C-alpha cells in the first residue's frame, strides 16, 4: 500500500467561453513510503492540479484518493496533521523576521519555541532567523517555507515546484535539504518540470503529460526505458582513434578528451576491435548516459503526447 494512492483521478475545469478543459485525465499513481518521489512533467501537465486534489484544495470529478491509508476523497480531517506542504510559493510575511513568521504559524499548530528553533536549524536558517524575510534570497525563502511545513513534524511532505525561479545556489540548497529529509524516513513528494534536478534528488519518479501517466518507477528503471544515444570512448591517442574509426566508417565526434561514437551500445565490441587492430587501446568505453529529459521526450513522443 502506498502513502499516496490515486485511482482514475480526473479533474475538469469549465472554460469561460464554454466547453471544458481536462487537467488530470484518469491518473493512477502509487507513491511508496519513505524517500524522495519526483512528480515530473512540463508546465501545464497537471502536476499542481493533482497536488491540489491530494491536499483537498479542489475536488476531483472522478476517481479515488488515499493518503496514509485513509480515504480522503471527502476531506483530510483524519490525516492533515501528518502532512506538510508548499503549493507554488510559500506564504510569508516579508516585513517580519523568519522566526516571527514561524511563531505565527506555530500558534496555529500549537508548537513551542523549541520546535521553531529546531526547524530553523534543520533548514540551516538559525543565523538569519531574526532578519526580515524581505532580506532573504529566494532560496532562503523557500527553505523557510519548508521549515513552516515541518512544524507539524509530518511524515509526508508535498512540495510543488520547490526549485522554480531559484538561482543555481538556491537550487543546490533546496536539493540538499530535500535529499536529507528523504533520508530521515519521510516521504517527500516533489513536483517539478526541471527534470535534470529531480534526477539528482529522487529515488522514484512518475512522468505525466496532459494529465496522464506516462511512466513510473525507480529512477534507474525509468532511465533504462530510454534508448542509449551512443558510446563514449576514451583513449590516449585521440587523433589515431579518430582516423581508425573514420576508416571503418564509424561516425565519431571529438568531445573534449573523449570520443562520442554514433553506434548503439550493443556494437561496443566492434569499436574495440577496430581500435585494437591499430594498436589504440581503450581507457574507457561506456554507453552515452541517458538523462530524465531525454527519456521524457522519448516516452511522451512514443505515447503521442510530445511536441
Regions found by a protein language model. Name each.
Residues 1, 265-307:
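C-terminal coupling/interaction segments
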Residues 9, 27, 283-285:
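Generic beta-strand hydrophobic packing signal
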Residues 69, 109, 235, 265, ...:
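Short loop or secondary-structure boundary microenvironments that flank
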Amino acid at each position: 500500500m502506498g502513502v499516496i494512492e490515486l485511482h482514475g483521478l480526473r479533474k475538469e475545469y469549465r472554460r469561460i467561453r464554454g466547453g471544458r478543459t481536462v487537467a488530470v485525465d484518469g491518473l493512477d499513481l502509487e507513491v511508496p513510503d519513505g524517500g524522495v518521489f519526483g512528480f515530473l512533467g512540463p508546465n501545464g501537465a497537471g502536476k499542481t492540479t493533482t497536488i491540489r486534489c491530494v491536499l483537498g484544495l479542489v475536488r476531483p470529478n472522478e476517481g479515488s484518493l488515499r493518503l496514509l491509508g485513509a480515504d480522503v476523497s471527502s476531506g483530510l480531517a483524519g490525516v492533515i496533521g501528518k502532512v506538510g506542504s508548499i503549493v507554488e510559493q510559500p506564504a510569508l510575511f516579508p516585513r517580519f523576521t523568519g522566526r516571527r513568521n514561524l511563531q505565527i504559524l506555530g500558534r496555529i499548530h500549537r508548537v513551542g519555541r523549541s520546535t521553531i528553533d529546531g526547524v530553523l536549524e534543520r533548514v540551516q536558517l538559525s543565523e538569519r532567523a531574526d532578519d526580515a524575510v524581505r532580506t532573504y534570497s529566494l532560496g532562503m525563502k523557500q527553505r523557510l517555507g519548508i521549515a513552516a511545513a515541518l512544524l507539524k513534524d509530518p511524515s509526508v511532505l508535498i512540495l510543488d515546484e520547490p526549485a522554480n525561479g531559484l538561482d543555481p545556489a538556491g537550487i543546490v540548497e533546496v536539493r540538499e535539504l530535500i535529499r536529507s529529509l528523504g533520508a530521515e524516513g519521510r516521504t517527500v513528494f516533489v513536483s517539478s518540470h526541471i527534470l535534470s534536478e529531480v534526477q539528482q534528488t529522487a529515488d522514484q519518479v512518475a512522468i505525466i503529460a496532459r494529465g496522464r501517466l506516462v511512466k513510473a518507477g525507480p529512477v534507474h528503471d525509468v532511465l533504462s526505458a530510454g534508448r542509449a544515444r551512443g558510446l563514449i570512448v576514451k583513449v590516449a591517442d585521440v587523433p589515431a582513434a579518430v582516423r581508425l574509426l573514420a576508416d571503418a566508417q564509424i561516425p565519431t565526434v571529438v568531445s573534449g578528451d573523449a570520443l562520442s561514437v554514433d553506434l548503439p551500445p550493443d556494437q561496443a565490441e566492434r569499436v574495440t576491435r577496430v581500435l585494437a587492430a591499430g594498436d589504440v587501446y581503450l581507457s574507457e568505453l561506456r554507453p552515452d548516459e541517458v538523462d530524465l529529459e531525454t527519456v521524457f521526450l522519448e516516452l511522451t513522443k512514443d505515447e503521442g503526447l510530445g511536441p
